[in-house]
Amino acid sequence: AMLATLFLLIITLAGMAVVVANALHNSPWGFFSVFATIPIAIFIGIYLKWLRPGKIQEATVIGVALIFAAIIYGPNVAASEYASWFTYDLQTIEIMLAVYGFFAAALPVWLLLAPRDYLSTYLKIGTIGALALGIIIVMPEIQMPAVTPYIWGGGPVLKGSVFPYIFITIACGALSGFHTVIATGTTPKMLTNEREILPIGYGAMLTEGFIAMMALIATTALHPDDYFAINSTVESFKALGLQVHELPALSAMVGEDLMHRPGGAVSLAVGMAHIFSKLPNMDHLLGYWYHFCIMFEALFIMTLIDAGTRVGRYLLQELLGHFHPKFNDQHWAPGVYGCAALICILWGYLVLQGNIGIIWPLFGVSNQLLGTMTLAVSTTVIMRLGRKRYAWVTDRKS
């Protein structure tokens, strides 16, 4: 069971990494803004650990200010002679993400993972709140039809029919195994008492549902052909005879080619930026809004990558500990670094060898299988404890 869980987790991490890589390749502004959060997080970790212990409010103000500075300074970097330092192709970005995953899984939690995830929380909440307000003010027209000709298969993004592809495509919004791994791995270590379980678990579910609604509105407000142009390959887009509408103008305003960047991150960022640009006196800031949204999404996903890779390291160490007890020691450097490296190599290899059309369905299926396993195990435990009536309300966050 542990080996199966590890295998499913590796596929899940590969699926997440593909989305970030497709959003950041050949994008100096986006790459600079997103990866600037790494040294910022390390600085905040050191600040709270040694420079000003316990001064969380100070660290929060400094960290958030530095993150916004990275976004604002991004276009200057993209237009400077140093732009080539932050411009990388797809494969290079994928390798960099695997290297980042290694350090996030091997370094102490307080140094990189915790401060980075903490700072990104403010960006996530603020961005989604601003998007909700923007939607209420702008009231964008939904352009995507409720039903397209592709529900029976043969679509430009995924070739399968709406059933069962809708469940494996939604991924975290459906039965989610990744959530169960984190909920039974890293989250319990951050709780001070059991009373925090309900507001965190149930609150996270409601928040994620709210985010899903905002994302759905933002992307369906795009013209369908523009949406497909972003999320499909060149070949499939041409084969269907589709034509772009607003996308060339949006690409010019953003300063990047937005065509054929599948994975969902770019289409969501374009949709969000399009809504924000419709606000009074905001039309000239579409480029900033787009890269701000890309940073929001990349931070959102990279928190999954670093936490998931660390959980994978824990699982692998525990598995190898059955053969060599030294691996059970979380302070044994060869075990920590070796297992972290192996996990990153495994999911990094999948990312390099596949594409979004292959990896995402694998990720979706694996994610649901892992969630099903957890659901069955947690329900069995409840019944073995003599609380059979509670088995009726067992959910994916159990």
Kindly give the residue locations of the regions a language model identified:
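Hydrophobic transmembrane alpha-helices that form the core helical bundles
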Residues: 1-49, 59-84, 250, 260-276, ...
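Hydrophobic alpha-helical segments and their helix-loop junctions in multi-pass secondary transporters
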Residues: 45-49, 65-95, 103-105, 125-151, ...
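Membrane-water interface regions at transmembrane-helix termini and the short interhelical loops
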Residues: 15-26, 39-58, 71-85, 99-119, ...
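Loop-to-transmembrane helix boundary motifs in multi-pass membrane proteins
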Residues: 2-8, 201-210, 262-264, 283-293, ...
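Extracellular/periplasmic helix-exit of transmembrane alpha-helices
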Residues: 135-151, 206-271, 307
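Conserved small/polar residues in nucleotide/adenosyl-binding loops
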Residues: 398
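Selective recognition of specific alpha-helical transmembrane segments in multi-pass small-molecule
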Residues: 5-13, 65-70, 121-142, 195-226, ...
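Hydrophobic, membrane-embedded alpha-helices of multi-pass small-molecule transporters
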Residues: 89-107, 133-140, 152-193, 200-202, ...
